[in-house]
Design a protein with these regions (language model features):
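Non-catalytic DNA-recognition/assembly elements of restriction-modification systems
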Residues: 104, 226-284, 380-448
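N-terminal, positively charged/glycine-rich alpha-helical extensions of SAM-dependent methyltransferases
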Residues: 1-3
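Conserved acidic residues
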Residues: 31, 101, 300
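Conserved residues in the N-terminal Rossmann fold of short-chain dehydrogenase/reductase
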Residues: 79
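Polybasic, glycine- and aromatic-enriched phosphate-binding surface used to engage nucleic acids
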Residues: 244-386
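Conserved class I S-adenosyl-L-methionine
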Residues: 30-37
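Proline-centric
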Residues: 21-23, 27, 110, 144-148, ...
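Signature of N6-adenine DNA methyltransferases within the class I
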Residues: 6-7, 12-20, 24, 37-45, ...
Length: 448
């Protein structure tokens, strides 16, 4: 039943992906393999089809286990709640004398709440899960640590946002400091009924110093290697760089400039006004307001809170107007500083950084919340400050999306690159990257 599975966070992996993962892992002959949330058993069958004999599985769903047993023809599969039971009890129920070499699978991912619970008296375990993000897949990872041998490998399909969402930071930091991330494969929105993107993360139970994480993409039914990043580079959030150029640009921007959150003197956050006249996200367009003239004085920038890669930042100077909760507000010193910030925000450089390194290259609709905007590299450059302010004022006065408007936007991009000392090769690369994802309506070269 689709609604039952969705409510329980159950998304079965098809044979194609499970077989590809088994092949990718290059599991040695004779290794002991366990899928502790095996569902109907596609990982089990894939492992057996690859010649592995020591394959074990368990799941809380008796009907799924019955189907798994019929499909696989093996007896090492049992009905068991592997989130509620600890590792020793799970191994004993499966008649395994010691932890296994490989823990694989696609554990359920759904937030723990009054309807979704883990039935265990182990308060320390529940406390760790709660402090690490309070989701069933978090519990599954902690249990996997108990099920894998000291040099064992854990390979799970989990939500991509595990890599950067703040609530998961405790477990992320533990993995970075005490385990070894062998690889991360970005498979995008693989399960169409899931709200979000997924990754395949493969860990070694022990920590190996001076290790590089292999990062892969997924396309044409293949895992495509992108690059390797030292695990020591990360201390909390894990960014999936697409190539060496992205990695190089990120390191330079991070090391050379302060962040917007460190430089902004005022409020950065959601609008709070309940007034019927408050500006909403839909009232904003790039550099102007749809139903009102742009104010001349004030200290506020209004940004549509909904962000899409196709459009990028949509924001306007808003003077002293009030904003609803569908708007992100930045307040700073005066109208000139606000217009300078506005120019930076609309640049391709800013949107490139936001998409790639704040949203971790997500293709889904995101939000321009303060926690993301504050990460943007920011410099008040005396050489280009007045140029950017002048171009923004010109854009406010020019007919929206006219040829003159687009020409001014291109001039703005050039000046922002100058502001950040981005050379021609890197600016050309960033332009090309953004034109791949942005809608053609925002590309002046396509408009001409």
């Amino acid at each position: 039943d689709a609604s039952y599975k969705k409510g329980k966070g159950i998304y079965y992996t098809d044979m194609e992906l499970s077989s590809r993962i088994i092949k990718f892992l290059e599991i040695p002959c004779g290794a002991y393999i366990l899928d502790p949330c095996c569902g109907t058993g596609n990982f089990i069958v894939s492992a057996r089809n690859s010649g592995h004999e020591n394959v074990y599985g368990s799941d809380i769903d008796a009907n799924a286990i019955a189907l798994c047993q019929r499909k696989s023809g093996i007896k090492n599969i049992t009905v068991l709640d592997t989130l509620a039971n600890n590792g020793k009890d799970i191994l004993r129920e499966l008649h395994l004398k010691s932890p296994v070499d490989y823990v694989i699978g696609n554990p359920p991912y759904v937030p723990i709440n009054k309807d979704i619970t883990i039935d265990t008296p182990d308060r320390l375990f529940l406390k760790s899960v709660k402090e690490s993000g309070s989701n069933l897949f978090i519990a599954a990872i902690y249990r996997a640590f108990e099920l894998a041998c000291p040099d064992g490998v854990i390979s799970y399909i989990i939500p991509k946002n595990f890599l950067h969402v703040a609530s998961y930071s405790k477990l992320r930091k533990l993995i970075l400091s005490e385990k070894t991330i062998l690889s991360i494969i970005d498979i995008g929105v693989y399960f169409k009924s899931v709200r979000g993107e997924q990754i395949i993360i493969t860990l070694k139970s022990s920590h190996v110093p001076n290790h590089n994480i292999r990062i892969y993409g997924y396309g044409d039914n293949e895992f495509i290697k992108r690059l390797e990043v030292p695990q020591s580079f990360y201390d909390n959030e894990i960014l999936l760089f697409e190539n060496e150029t992205d990695f190089r640009i990120y390191k330079r921007l991070e090391s050379s400039y302060k962040k917007l959150g460190d430089s902004c003197t005022g409020y950065v956050g959601r609008g709070k006004s309940k007034s019927p006249s408050a500006v909403t996200g839909k009232d904003i367009r790039k550099f102007s307001l749809k139903n009102a003239p742009v104010p001349q004085k004030g200290d506020r920038v209004f940004i549509q809170n909904i962000y899409s890669a196709e459009a990028g930042i949509i924001a306007s100077f808003a003077g002293n107007l009030e904003a609803s909760e569908t708007v992100t507000v930045i307040t700073d010193r005066d109208e000139n500083m606000c217009r300078y910030i506005l120019g930076i925000l609309h640049s391709r450089l800013c949107n490139y950084f936001l998409l790639k390194f704040c949203y971790n290259n997500s293709k889904l609709t995101m939000h321009t919340d303060a926690k993301y905007l504050k990460k943007l590299p920011f410099i008040i450059n005396s050489r280009t400050f007045n140029k950017i302010v002048s171009i923004v004022k010109l854009l406010e006065q020019t007919r929206y999306m006219s040829n003159e408007w687009f020409e001014a936007v291109e001039s703005l991009n050039d000046v922002v690159y100058e502001t950040y000392d981005i050379g021609r090769a890197e600016s050309g690369y960033i332009d090309a990257q953004m034109r791949e994802v942005q809608s053609g309506k925002w590309d002046y070269n396509r408009q001409k």
